[in-house]
Amino acid sequence: GQPGTGMGQALDILAGRYGATRVSPPSIRQILAADSGWLDDWPTDSLWVLPDLEACFLRHVQGISIIRDFFDRLASGRLGKGIIGCDSWAWAYLQMIWPVPLPALTLQPFDAPRLYRLLHSLLLPTARPVDFRHAVTGKTVIAISDSPEQQPADNAELINMAAQSRGNPAQALYQWRNRLRTEPEPSDEKGQDPKESAGSKTLWLADTPDDPVVPSSSREEHLLVLHTLLLHGGLEATLLPQLLPFPDSHCQWLLARLHQAGLAGPGRDGKWRVSEAAYRPVCQILRGHQFLLDHFQRAG
């Protein structure tokens, strides 16, 4: 699935509901040592779920042997039956490691109608229609009614959201929330009525904020770090020197620059990831520099 969409959590819930065995990824030591013990202990006699395949390899000469062995056993049926979850960027890389086609499913990208239903589902507890207006002009951008079926046809705002996010609902929702305001912004325009309609609530949408910018100095090096973070679904900082042609001190400097620019940062699990604010512009830059992209960024 696309980054931020919660595919791993969904598979965890699925495993609990159907009594499947949850398989944890190998440790970093096991990955680098190509320790087959992780695979030898596989629960082949029961349904299993591996929700995070992206955590089972490293883009390193010694970090892909274990995933090759995994695919070999999987294709031969020696691992039994199970469900595998994988980040879309990692999957793009792994398809180069193991080019034999494997059946894969992904959620359909969110288009404008689906985004409308998503926004409606988040607003249901208010039990009031919501009128979203432009924070400067006061013009209605979109009105969300009581019924999820009463979605506006060809709404330009939702169509643009779907296109900008490439169907990633987490990205679309982040951008939407980032623009929300409780009060309109000062404007010289006249004739707009800022008052709430009877029975509805008004919220304001500001212009899309400026994107974070990749530092111009050592630009290619920063892009290599960002791409590596995407391919692995996030990484601990200590692993970067093993995956990139830079010493530890330089990797730490690059991460500090990316963090300062709002492009990446550490999560609660200690792994560094591309930030939500930076995901879209980073993907655009990587596309322009001919980096390997996931299916969603290549499409269209």
Set out the residue ranges of the language-model regions.
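Walker A/P-loop nucleotide-binding motif
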Residues: 1-11
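Conserved P-loop NTPase "ATPase switch" module shared by AAA+ and STAND
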Residues: 23-67, 84-86
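Sensor-1/coupling segment of RecA-like P-loop NTPase cores
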Residues: 55-97, 104-108, 112-115
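Conserved small helical "lid"/interfacial subdomain of P-loop NTPases
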Residues: 105-154, 164
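The conserved phosphate-sensing helix
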Residues: 150-177
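Winged-helix-like regulatory helical subdomains adjacent to P-loop NTPase cores
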Residues: 170, 174-250
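Short amphipathic alpha-helical interaction segments
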Residues: 245-261, 266, 277
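Short, amphipathic alpha-helical interaction segments positioned at domain boundaries
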Residues: 278-300
